[in-house]
From Swiss-Prot:
This is Albumin-1 C. PA1b binds to basic 7S globulin (BG) and stimulates its phosphorylation activity. Involved in the signal transduction system to regulate the growth and differentiation as a hormone peptide. Toxic to various insects through binding to a high affinity binding site in the insect gut. Pfam families: Albumin_I (PF08027), Albumin_I_a (PF16720). Residues 1-26 form the signal peptide. Residues 64-69, 123-130 form a propeptide. The presence of a 'disulfide through disulfide knot' structurally defines this protein as a knottin. It comes from the Eukaryota. It comes from Pisum sativum. Major component of both the cotyledons and embryonic axes of mature seeds.
Length: 130
């Protein structure tokens, strides 16, 4: 009887050990980020989900953006997203190629004005021509 209890205890600890072992090679997608940094989270495997125009949170990209994009009033993928949310008429995409979404503005000129105050001029050229 004691050996059965001991065997059960060993199996329990072995199972817990498998789940609690830290994955040494894993990349952490947590923390604060800026959508203007390249790559924004220190790894191209993570995405920066903006909480504001210049600050966001690093997240694993799978499934997070679709939910966040719908919930956040200023995140957009197109001008139609901004109009649908009532946040503006122009989706100004971040000048960072690692960020696949943008921020809603009232107009293209407002987006260019805001981004020109934040980003280097060479990054802004790619936004204006897009």
């Amino acid at each position: 009887m004691a050996s059965v209890k001991l065997a059960s205890l060993i199996v329990l600890f072995a199972t817990l050990g498998m789940f609690l072992t830290k994955n040494v090679g894993a990349i952490s997608c947590n923390g604060v980020c800026s959508p203007f940094d390249i790559p924004p989270c220190g790894s191209p495997l993570c995405r920066c989900i903006p909480a504001g125009l210049v600050i966001g949170n690093c997240r694993n990209p799978y499934g997070v953006f679709l939910r966040t994009n719908d919930e956040h009033p200023n995140l957009c993928e197109s001008d139609a997203d901004c109009r649908k949310k009532g946040s503006g008429t122009f989706c100004g995409h971040y000048p960072n190629p690692d960020i696949e979404y943008g921020w809603c503005f009232a107009s293209k000129s407002e987006a260019e004005d805001v981004f020109s105050k934040i980003t280097p001029k060479d990054l802004l050229k790619s936004v204006s021509t897009a």
